[in-house]
Amino acid sequence: MSTTDIYNYLKISERLVTGGQPTADQLRDAAAEGFTAVINLYPSNPPHSLDGEGELVESLGMAYVHIPVDWSNPTDADFAAFESAMNRLAGEKVLIHCAANFRVTAFYGLYARKHLGWPDEQAEAFRAQIWAGSDYPIWEAFIARHSA
């Protein structure tokens, strides 16, 4: 098993991957593969989240950032917290996840557009590997607001 087995796994670079909710074993694999940080955008919601995830991640020697983004109400504050975490962890090997890599692909696409110079088309194509924003009007509006 490895991090590549995480649900909806996407590799952005050697230092950055995204995915859905990892199992405890997949988090152990992440530590063994040299990841130094985990950003979790999924609210604590057992059984869909991993109970004690933060403690496990930290016990494995990785930094843990939890930004619980409500699927039905993503906020500007959520995105600002994500931007701050990404900027703080620049240069680290980071696993970013939520439940199914929906929140993450939206947030990372917006982040990469704003901070890494990705054109709109690249950010859209990145997210579209996992889901279509038009399927979720709240998210479509959130993405449009941050793309303006």
Give, region by region, the residue ranges found by the protein language model.
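Mobile, glycine- and charge-enriched loop segments
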Residues: 1-20, 62
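Cysteine-based protein phosphatase catalytic domain of the PTP/DSP
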Residues: 17-88
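N-proximal short alpha-helices
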Residues: 3-4, 11, 30, 55, ...
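Phosphate- and divalent-cation-binding pockets in alpha/beta enzyme and binding domains
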Residues: 26, 106-107
